[in-house]
Amino acid sequence: MDLYEKYFFDLNGYLVVPDALTADELAQCNDAINNNTDQMRERPEEKSLSGESRTLKGQQGRGDLDGMLTWPRPWCDPFRHLLAHPVIVPYLVELLRDGFRLDHLYGIIMRLGTEGHVLHGGGTADDLTHFYQYHNGRMRCGLTVVAGAVTDCGPGDGGFACIPGSHKSNYPAPRDVILLDKDIGVVTQVEAKAGSAIIFTEALTHGTMPWKASHDRRSILYKYSPGPLTYAKTYLPQGVEAVLDEFTPEQRAILEPPYRPNRPTFATDGILRQAI
């Protein structure tokens, strides 16, 4: 992270990294999704994410994608590559330290009219897995998300939204504000071109605005934790253990369970320093 990126992330709690993915990587992700549409599950009404919000209501629930790391080849390959992407790893080393690990991942598909997601998280939450601190001259985070934009998310489209700076807030956001039913000018819809990565701390108050664009929103969310911590109950995505030998040393390092001593680590340039 350069000086400007550090300042922006510390101030806002998120950062957009443009062109994190190449055109080829982007095409491979979209091709994989196109060939596995049967893996998408649209949320039924009883699992709605919009709560009691009037503003976030939609015509249908969000589409969720799971299991990308174990899809048949070649469709799993682009998502395995993203695990330890050379552009992203240096950011994770800065925010989570050199022994970071994958906590969990999933994909999001939103078509025109898909509901939004109530804003959640924030600096007031007493959660030992969702935190943001500045310590000894460096930022450090708990659970941190890398949301890869597989399609464009332009102005007014909807999608990822947050309250910038709320990762350091001292007051909880009022309920009608996180429902987006009252606008006091603090919520931002974050624009991201396809191929961009939105990196944010889960300590940030964030959620999703209803999708209003004619094209689908496609986003793949990789959620990482510091090496000794876990948020998810399980340590590996379902089915991965059986095919772990197919992953590269860098990918296997990131799939390690939570522990502290003698973890495989990455240098600030993203190079694996200690292989398993």
Where would I find each of the regions flagged by the language model?
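Non-heme Fe(II)-dependent double-stranded beta-helix
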Residues: 1-11, 18-135
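Double-stranded beta-helix
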Residues: 7, 139-145, 151-209
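A structural signal for short, well-ordered beta-strand segments
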Residues: 105-107, 146-148, 220-224
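A short secondary-structure junction signal
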Residues: 115-121, 128-131, 156-162, 171-175, ...
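Structural motif
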Residues: 116, 145, 160, 217-219
